[in-house]
C-alpha cells in the first residue's frame, strides 16, 4: 500500500476478534507484534499484517510501546482488531478486476 | 439573581472566566516534558552521519524529572562566505523530505558520541547541570525537525547551501538533553555554555509546568520557557570548528534541567533566514565570534510563506514559542496579519507543517484578548480546524486542534460557529469513540469504558462552552446524534470506575446540566407531558407504563445496567409514559435513571465544579411542570438522594451550596419531598443563614447569591407547610433571619429573609410561640420594612401569597437563585476552573504545560472567577513516538 504521509489512506481491512487467554495473572494474546512508527519499517519483523485499529484505538500512528499497551490492556478481555494485509489487498483488487 | 431568562450564568461573567488571564499559571506552550516520576525511560539516540554509519546510543534514564525546557533560537553562525558555518562535512539536507527524521531522534541526549564526527572534535561542551531528563525532551529535538519516524540511514546530502544549520541540528540533538546521571554515560565533549552575544530573552516567563496525569509517559513535551535569566546557558549544539561554539540552539532550562535543543526548527529557519536576509549583525565583523540574532516577528511570519516546507514548520513552531504567555506578541501577530497565514497552513500537505501551525494557533487563540479569536474566525479558522481534525490520525494534532477549539469556544460569538462547523465532527470523531459508547452494543461484549484522553477532555471542554450559548445551541447539541448517549455512557463509566474528579467528567456533567436546562419547554414533544401543576404522585397524565425489567426501556444502554430491576421498584406508584422503544438521544436527559447517575456523582466526586453541575442538573430536571419532572423529583427521593443533597449543604464551597439549595427548592415541589426536606434540611439551611449573618471566620462569608438561594429555599419549604415552619422555629431560624435582615449589606438578602419572616408570621398557629420568644409583629414588620417593602420578594413576582399556583414558584425556582443552568461556559482552556479550588486536586490540568497554572490557581481563593484554565500547550516538541530504534523491536502480547 503506498501512501502519502499526511493524506488519508484507504485500505482493505479484516476484522479480527481475539479473546485473550488467561495465563497466570495476565491476559495474553499469544502472538508477537513488531513495528510501530518509531521503528524502522524496513526492518519490521512481521511485515505482512498491519494493524489499523485495536478496540477502536487507532494504530496507524503509534509507537511500538503504545501499540503494545493497547493490546495488553488489562481491562479488556477481547481485542478487536482491524488488520490489513497485502495479500488481502491484492486479493480484493484481483477480484474486483475480474 | 439573574432572572430565569438565562438559566445560565450570564455570559459576561462566564466570559470573564473564560478568558483566563494570562496568569503565569497558564501554560500555553506545549513544550512540556512531563513524565510520571519514576518511570524509567530509555532513550536511544541515533545519529547518522553522512557516510552512512549510524551510531546508536541508548541511555536509560531511571529517574524522570519534569523537564522545563527553554528554548532559544539562535542563528547559525555564518562563516566567511555568509553561509552557516558548518564544521566540515556536507550540510545535511534537513529539509529534504524525510531526511531529518532519521537523525534527529536524539533521545536521552546522547553524549557527544552521537555527534557527528565533525562536531565531535570540536570539543563542545555540554551544558552543565542538567539533570537527567527524560527522553521526551530529547525527543523534542526530532520533533523540532518535525520528523517523527526515525529512519536509519545516512544523512542525506543537504542542500548545498548549507545554510540550514544542519550540522547544528545534529549537534543540537546530541547535545541537548543531558541524559541520565552524568556518570552513566560518557560525555566526551563538554560544551562550554557561554553567552554568545545573545540578548536576554525576556519574552515569556514560562511558568512551571507540572505535568498532569493525562500525559502519557511517552509524550515528551518539553516546556518551552524562556526564563528571564537570559540566555546565559546554552546548549551548544555543536562546536564550530571555527569558534568556540556557535550555539545554534539554546535550550535553556530554567533550572538545572536538561535542555532539549528544541531549536532545530528554528535553526533551520534561522539558517534560511540568515541566508535570505543576511542580517546577522555581527557576522561580518566578527567571524570568529558570530553573533546571533533572533528573527524578528515579521521575519518569522515571512518564513511562514517560505517555499521550503520545513522552514514553514519551524517558523510556526518558533512562533508558538514566541507567543507563549505574551499578549503583546499575540497582538502583533494579528496586526501583522499572521493569523490567516497560519490558518492557511492548516491545510498544508505536510503533516509537520499542519501540526506546527496548529500549535501556534493554539497559543494565539488563548488569552483574555478576544481579538485573536475573532480574527481566527474571520479567516476561516474554525472550518479549517475541523477539517484538520477529521483528517488527522496523529494524536498530537488532534489534541492541538481540540485545544484550539476549546480556546475559541470561550468567545461567545464563536460558539455558534463552532457548533455549525464542528459539532458533528467533534461528536463523531472524539466524543463517541472515546466515551466507550457503542451505537449498537454488541450483546456479547461488555460495555467499554471511557477513555479519558486529552483529546476527549479538550473536546468536552469545547462542547461545554458552546452548550451555554442559549436555546438554539442547546437544541443543536441535544439533537446531535449520539452526543447525549455518549456523554451519559462516559459518565456512567466514570462512576463505575470511581474516577469522577477529572476534568473530562466535569466537562461532561456540565454539558448535561446545560442541556437539561428547560427541557420541559424545549425538547420536541414536551407539551405532551405538561401537567397543570406538579401534582401528587401518580397523577401523571399518561397511561400506565408497562414495567419491564428491560434495560432498553431505560435508554438502551448496556451500561452497568444493574439499575433496571431496581428502577422498576421506584415507579410502583408512578405511571411512567409508555415507551415503545428505548430512549435515546436527548430523551436520555430526563429519564429517571439519570438520577442515580447524578446522585452517584454527588456522592463520590470531590470536584466542586462537578458537584455543582450535578446538583444543577437535578435542579434543572426538577423544575418545570411536566411529567418527567414529577418522576424525577420522586425518583430522587426514592434513590435516597435527599440526604446526599442535604449533606452537601455543608460544603465549604459557595457554588455547591448554592446549587444544592436551589435543587432542594425545586425538589420540594413534590409534597413528600417538601416534608422530608423541611425536617432534615432545616438545620443545615439555617446554619448557612447563620453563617451568612455571622461568619464563623473571616473569609467564610457566603456570597450573596448563595445566601439568597438558601433563603429562597427556606421560604419555599415553609410556605404552605405549617410543620416546616415549625421546624424553622425549632432550628432557631427566626433570630438568624432577623439578624440577617438587620445586618446584611445586601438588599436582596434582606428582602429574602424578611420574606421568610413574613410567611412565618402568617401562620397564626405559630404566633403564640413566637410571641413567647419575644417576637412581636412589630419586630417582624420592622425587619420586613428594613428590607424595603412588605412584600419584598427575592424574586420577581413576589409570592407572598400562598394561593399563587405552585407553578410560579417552580418557575421562580428556576429563575432565581443563581443559575438554573450553569453554563460553565468559560471554563474552557480559557476558564479552567479545575485547578482553582484549593481542595481540588489539579488533575484536570494534566498534560503538557497546563500544569503550570495549578500553582497560582490554588492560591486563588475567589470562586467567582476561576482562573482561566490553561489552553493546552500547543506544541509538543517531543515526539510522542518513542525512541528511534535501529533494530526492530517486537513484543509479546
Swiss-Prot record, chain A:
<dbReference type="GO" id="GO:0007266">
    <property type="term" value="P:Rho protein signal transduction"/>
</dbReference>
<dbReference type="GO" id="GO:0016055">
    <property type="term" value="P:Wnt signaling pathway"/>
</dbReference>
<keyword id="KW-1003">Cell membrane</keyword>
<keyword id="KW-0007">Acetylation</keyword>
<dbReference type="GO" id="GO:0005886">
    <property type="term" value="C:plasma membrane"/>
</dbReference>
<feature type="modified residue" description="N-acetylserine">
    <location>
        <position position="2"/>
    </location>
</feature>
<keyword id="KW-0472">Membrane</keyword>
<dbReference type="GO" id="GO:0005634">
    <property type="term" value="C:nucleus"/>
</dbReference>
<comment type="subunit">
    <text>Interacts (via its PDZ domain) with GLS2. Interacts (via its PDZ domain) with RTKN (via the C-terminal region); this interaction facilitates Rho-mediated activation of the FOS serum response element (SRE). Interacts (via PDZ domain) with ARHGEF16. Interacts (via PDZ domain) with KCNJ4 (via C-terminus). Competes with LIN7A for KCNJ4 binding. Interacts (via its PDZ domain) with CTNNB1; this interaction inhibits the transcriptional activity of CTNNB1. Interacts with ADGRB2.</text>
</comment>
<keyword id="KW-0963">Cytoplasm</keyword>
<dbReference type="GO" id="GO:0005737">
    <property type="term" value="C:cytoplasm"/>
</dbReference>
<comment type="function">
    <text>May regulate a number of protein-protein interactions by competing for PDZ domain binding sites. Binds CTNNB1 and may thereby act as an inhibitor of the Wnt signaling pathway. Competes with LIN7A for KCNJ4 binding, and thereby promotes KCNJ4 internalization. May play a role in the Rho signaling pathway.</text>
</comment>
<keyword id="KW-0539">Nucleus</keyword>
<dbReference type="GO" id="GO:0030178">
    <property type="term" value="P:negative regulation of Wnt signaling pathway"/>
</dbReference>
<dbReference type="GO" id="GO:2000009">
    <property type="term" value="P:negative regulation of protein localization to cell surface"/>
</dbReference>
<dbReference type="InterPro" id="IPR036034">
    <property type="entry name" value="PDZ_sf"/>
</dbReference>
<dbReference type="GO" id="GO:0008285">
    <property type="term" value="P:negative regulation of cell population proliferation"/>
</dbReference>
<protein>
    <recommendedName>
        <fullName>Tax1-binding protein 3</fullName>
    </recommendedName>
</protein>
<dbReference type="GO" id="GO:0008013">
    <property type="term" value="F:beta-catenin binding"/>
</dbReference>
<keyword id="KW-0879">Wnt signaling pathway</keyword>
<feature type="domain" description="PDZ">
    <location>
        <begin position="12"/>
        <end position="87"/>
    </location>
</feature>
Amino acid at each position: 500500500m503506498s501512501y502519502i504521509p499526511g493524506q488519508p489512506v484507504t485500505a482493505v481491512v479484516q476484522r479480527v476478534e481475539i479473546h485473550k487467554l488467561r495465563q497466570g495473572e495476565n491476559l495474553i494474546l499469544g502472538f508477537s507484534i513488531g513495528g510501530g512508527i518509531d521503528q524502522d519499517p524496513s526492518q519490521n519483523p512481521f511485515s505482512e499484517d498491519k494493524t489499523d485499529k485495536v478496540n477502536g484505538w487507532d494504530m496507524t500512528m503509534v509507537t511500538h510501546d503504545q501499540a503494545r499497551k493497547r493490546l495488553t490492556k488489562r481491562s479488556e478481555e477481547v481485542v478487536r482488531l482491524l488488520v490489513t494485509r497485502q495479500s488481502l489487498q491484492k486479493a480484493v483488487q484481483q477480484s474486483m478486476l475480474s | 439573581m439573574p432572572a430565569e431568562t438565562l438559566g445560565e450564568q450570564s455570559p459576561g461573567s462566564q466570559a470573564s472566566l473564560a478568558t483566563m488571564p494570562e496568569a503565569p499559571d497558564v501554560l500555553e506552550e506545549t513544550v512540556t516534558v512531563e513524565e510520571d516520576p519514576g518511570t524509567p525511560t530509555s532513550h536511544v539516540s541515533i545519529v547518522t552521519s553522512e557516510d552512512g554509519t549510524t551510531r546508536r546510543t541508548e541511555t536509560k534514564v531511571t529517574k524522570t524529572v519534569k523537564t522545563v525546557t527553554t528554548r532559544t533560537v539562535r542563528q547559525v553562525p555564518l562563516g566567511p562566505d555568509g553561509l552557516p558555518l558548518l564544521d566540515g562535512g556536507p550540510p545535511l539536507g534537513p529539509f529534504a523530505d524525510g531526511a531529518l527524521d532519521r537523525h534527529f531522534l536524539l533521545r536521552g541526549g546522547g553524549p557527544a558520541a552521537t555527534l557527528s564526527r565533525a562536531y565531535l572534535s570540536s570539543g563542545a561542551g555540554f551544558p552543565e547541570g542538567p539533570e537527567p531528563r527524560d527522553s521526551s525532551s530529547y525527543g523534542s529535538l526530532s520533533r523540532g525537525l518535525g520528523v517523527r519516524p526515525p529512519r536509519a540511514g545516512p544523512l542525506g546530502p543537504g542542500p548545498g547551501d548549507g545554510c540550514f544549520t544542519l550540522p547544528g541540528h545534529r549537534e543540537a540533538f546530541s547535545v541537548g538533553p543531558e541524559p541520565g546521571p552524568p556518570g552513566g554515560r560518557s560525555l566526551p565533549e563538554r560544551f562550554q555554555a557561554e553567552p554568545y552575544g545573545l540578548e536576554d530573552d525576556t519574552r515569556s516567563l514560562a511558568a512551571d509546568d507540572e505535568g498532569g496525569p493525562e500525559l502519557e509517559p511517552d509524550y515528551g513535551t518539553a516546556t518551552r520557557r524562556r526564563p528571564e535569566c537570559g540566555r546565559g546557558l546554552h546548549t551548544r549544539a555543536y562546536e564550530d570548528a571555527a569558534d568556540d561554539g556557535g550555539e545554534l540552539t539554546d535550550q535553556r532550562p530554567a533550572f538545572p534541567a536538561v535542555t532539549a535543543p528544541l531549536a532545530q526548527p528554528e535553526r533551520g529557519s534561522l539558517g534560511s533566514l540568515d541566508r535570505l536576509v543576511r542580517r546577522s549583525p555581527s557576522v561580518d565583523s566578527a567571524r570568529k565570534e558570530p553573533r546571533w540574532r533572533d528573527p524578528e516577528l515579521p521575519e518569522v511570519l515571512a518564513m511562514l510563506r517560505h517555499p521550503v516546507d520545513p522552514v514553514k514548520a519551524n517558523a510556526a513552531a518558533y512562533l508558538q514559542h514566541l507567543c507563549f504567555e505574551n499578549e503583546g506578541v499575540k497582538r502583533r501577530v494579528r496586526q501583522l496579519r499572521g493569523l490567516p497565514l497560519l490558518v492557511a497552513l492548516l491545510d498544508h500537505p505536510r503533516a509537520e507543517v499542519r501540526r506546527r501551525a496548529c500549535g501556534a494557533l493554539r497559543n494565539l487563540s488563548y488569552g483574555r484578548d478576544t481579538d485573536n479569536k475573532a480574527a481566527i474566525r474571520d479567516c476561516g479558522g474554525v472550518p479549517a480546524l475541523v477539517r484538520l481534525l477529521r483528517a488527522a490520525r496523529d494524536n498530537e494534532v488532534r489534541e492541538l486542534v481540540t485545544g484550539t477549539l476549546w480556546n475559541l469556544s470561550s468567545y461567545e460569538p464563536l460558539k455558534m460557529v463552532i457548533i455549525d462547523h464542528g459539532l458533528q465532527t467533534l461528536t463523531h470523531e472524539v466524543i463517541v469513540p472515546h466515551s466507550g459508547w457503542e451505537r449498537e452494543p454488541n450483546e456479547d461484549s461488555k460495555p467499554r469504558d471511557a477513555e479519558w484522553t486529552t483529546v476527549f477532555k479538550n473536546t468536552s471542554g469545547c462542547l461545554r462552552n458552546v452548550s451555554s450559548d442559549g436555546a438554539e445551541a442547546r437544541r443543536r447539541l441535544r439533537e446531535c446524534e449520539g452526543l447525549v448517549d455518549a456523554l451519559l455512557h462516559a459518565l456512567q463509566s466514570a462512576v463505575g470506575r470511581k474516577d469522577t474528579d477529572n476534568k473530562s467528567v466535569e466537562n461532561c456533567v456540565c454539558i448535561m446540566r446545560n442541556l437539561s436546562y428547560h427541557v420541559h419547554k424545549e425538547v420536541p414533544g414536551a407539551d405532551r407531558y405538561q401537567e397543570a401543576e406538579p401534582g401528587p404522585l401518580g397523577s401523571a397524565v399518561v397511561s400506565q407504563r408497562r414495567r419491564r425489567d428491560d434495560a432498553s426501556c431505560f435508554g438502551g444502554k448496556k451500561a452497568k445496567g444493574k439499575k433496571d430491576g431496581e428502577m422498576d421498584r421506584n415507579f410502583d406508584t408512578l405511571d411512567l409514559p409508555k415507551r415503545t422503544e428505548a430512549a435515546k438521544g436527548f430523551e436520555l436527559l430526563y429519564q429517571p435513571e439519570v438520577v442515580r447517575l447524578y446522585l452517584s456523582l454527588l456522592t463520590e466526586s470531590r470536584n466542586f465544579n462537578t458537584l455543582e453541575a450535578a446538583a444543577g442538573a437535578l435542579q434543572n430536571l426538577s423544575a418545570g411542570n411536566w411529567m418527567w419532572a414529577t418522576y424525577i423529583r420522586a425518583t430522587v427521593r426514592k434513590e435516597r438522594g435527599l440526604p446526599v443533597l442535604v449533606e452537601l449543604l455543608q460544603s465549604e464551597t459557595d457554588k455547591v451550596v448554592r446549587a444544592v439549595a436551589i435543587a432542594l427548592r425545586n425538589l420540594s415541589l413534590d409534597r413528600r419531598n417538601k416534608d422530608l426536606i423541611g425536617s432534615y434540611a432545616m438545620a443545615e439551611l439555617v446554619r448557612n443563614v447563620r453563617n451568612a449573618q455571622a461568619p464563623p471566620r473571616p473569609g467564610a462569608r457566603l456570597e450573596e447569591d448563595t445566601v439568597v438561594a438558601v433563603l429562597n429555599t427556606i421560604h419555599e419549604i415553609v410556605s404552605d407547610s405549617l410543620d416546616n415552619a415549625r421546624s424553622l422555629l425549632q432550628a432557631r431560624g427566626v433570630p438568624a433571619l432577623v439578624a440577617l435582615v438587620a445586618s446584611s449589606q445586601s438588599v436582596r438578602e434582606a428582602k429574602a429573609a424578611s420574606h421568610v419572616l413574613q410567611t412565618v408570621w402568617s401562620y397564626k398557629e405559630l404566633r403564640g410561640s413566637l410571641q413567647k420568644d419575644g417576637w412581636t409583629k412589630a419586630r417582624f414588620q420592622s425587619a420586613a420594612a428594613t428590607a424595603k417593602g412588605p412584600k419584598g420578594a427575592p424574586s420577581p413576582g413576589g409570592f407572598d401569597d400562598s394561593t399563587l399556583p405552585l407553578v410560579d414558584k417552580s418557575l421562580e425556582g428556576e429563575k432565581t437563585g443563581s443559575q438554573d443552568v450553569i453554563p460553565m461556559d468559560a471554563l474552557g482552556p480559557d476558564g479552567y476552573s479545575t485547578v482553582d479550588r484549593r481542595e481540588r486536586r489539579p488533575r484536570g490540568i494534566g498534560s503538557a504545560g497546563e500544569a503550570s497554572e495549578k500553582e497560582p490557581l490554588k492560591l486563588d481563593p475567589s470562586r467567582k472567577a476561576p482562573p482561566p484554565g490553561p489552553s493546552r500547550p500547543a506544541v509538543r516538541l517531543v515526539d510522542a513516538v518513542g525512541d528511534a530504534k535501529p533494530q526492530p523491536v517486537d513484543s509479546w502480547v
